[in-house]
Amino acid sequence: MPFSPLELIDVRLQVKMFQAGEFRQCWGRSTEMGQDGIGATLTGSLEPGEIVTLEIPLPLTPYPIKVRAIVRYRQGLRYGFEFLTLNDNQRDTIKRVCQYLATRA
């Protein structure tokens, strides 16, 4: 399955995860986003394969969206997340935001 093109986006996001028997969170800054996932630089440490919840404030939306994602890669402090189980509203919102970001590039 081909991934959608990535668009540049710079927003602060929160990452919530369950590690070592407790809930933890960290924050970061996004670097790019596509309809399938988002890249970010984080303050915390995650491993590929971990499942997290991302809270992402997006342009064109009044509230941050909350999405489940899996860590697909890690390069130093940079991470790539693939979105999991998006509902139709989340998918439409992310698609609209990516189209908006593409017009600003």
Where are these regions (language model features)?
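Short conserved beta-strand and strand-loop elements enriched in small hydrophobics
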Residues: 13-19, 50-62
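N-terminal helix initiation/capping motif
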Residues: 1-33, 99-105
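A residue-level detector for short acidic-glycine micro-motifs
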Residues: 32, 71-75, 85
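Residue-level recognition of conserved beta-strand positions in structured domain cores
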Residues: 42, 56, 67-69, 83-85
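Short beta-strand-centered aromatic/proline hotspots
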Residues: 26-28, 65-72
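Short alpha-helix capping/helix-loop boundary micro-motifs
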Residues: 36-41
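C-terminal output/interaction extensions
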Residues: 78-105
